[in-house]
Amino acid sequence: MQLTKQEQKMLDGEEGYAVQKSMEILTALGDIYGAKNLITVSSVQVAGVSYHNLGDAGLEFLNELAKDGRVKVLTTLNPAGMDLENWQQLGISPEFAEKQNLLIDAFERMGILVSCTCTPYLIGNLPLYGEHLAWSESSAVTFANSVIGAKTNREGGPSALAAAFVGKTPCYGLHLDENRIPDVHVQVNAEIAKLSDWGALGYAIGKKAENKISYITGIKSVDLDELKSFCASVVTYGAKPLFYMKGVTPGTELQTQPKETVIIEQADIKNAYDNINDFVTDIELVCVGCPHCSVNEISKVAELLRGKKVAEG
């Protein structure tokens, strides 16, 4: 990979340990995927925040990076392994909480905004059309590529953190226009009436489109919360973290409609519900906000609970 003189100095350790390690990660990644150079990113979103995933080895590594590592661009965090404020009420052990808080402290010393959310675009990390990013969380990556029209691969936690320290990422994959061309036309004939239908639609398209970029038509109207739900679902069940939705995605009119076509009928939506739903009689826990709720969604939940009491348990 071709490096500038400044990038080579970073790789040689002239800007400290954290930047050097980051350059080692980024150049190795670039070599693997055939990137010719690094490109500047406007923001980063880091996953791999939970102590459950990182353990003591991860904590030690992050503390080492935090000694001299400071992020060069706006950087936000994915959710941690617990609620940072109400962990005791949720039955989290003090031992786990202590280690999780040490991880958060390390990220904070790096200059990262400790947002702990999978919807960074709702809390200030909102990129512009065409900007290059290094984001990790799959639904957020899909939203950035498909709704905003920014450009990001689905980064791993280490590569995203490395991009934050350097301010750059290898130029490959969805950073390149030739890799952002739709492969399959998806015509939606089904009625998509409520929020959960968007999750079902994402399931149906993800299963049919598989690992392809969809050009979606037939959508009459959609709001931000519905797009958020759809992005989380479609990438979970098989599709690439980029789609073009006519009337939504910037630049859709510049894309050629693919020859391959799949149709989404009402039966596909019903099939999605049948496959996703777990039919249980006893519910122990209700979790709201995956991806994290918008203010509008929280307001709706509050309205539904007005004057009611949550069951004991």
Predicted regions located by residue number:
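Non-transmembrane, aqueous-exposed alpha-helical and coiled segments at domain scale
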Residues: 1-313
